[in-house]
């Protein structure tokens, strides 16, 4: 049974969202810790992307601020790894398919495991590509 499944077991889950790197990575790390202390069951971390088509203006602007502040996928992985030393609840990345493919699917999942990410949400994943990405996620124990 995955950690994400356990977060929902016999209850509703409180799942706050934060855009990684907005306003900066240190603040994001502190927010992750505070979210768990405030009672979060699972945390969703948005990976900043230059074209977040599935997002409204608030998250689009947060992504732009994070990118302007120098947030990269590698830096976000490193920050989550640091936060994971204190945050024990499941954490998932909300990302787009382009960053996953650009980074490399296998490499991306390996980094997710190394930093303690439990799953990913990919809102623009084409149905035709779901099985392929699902297989890679499954091989690394990452929920999709």
Question: Where in this protein do the model-derived segments appear?
Answer:
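Catalytic beta/alpha-barrel core
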Residues: 68-71, 116-129, 141-144
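Conserved beta-strand positions in the central sheet of alpha/beta enzyme cores
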Residues: 15, 41-44, 121
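Conserved, mostly hydrophobic/aromatic
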Residues: 16, 35, 46, 112
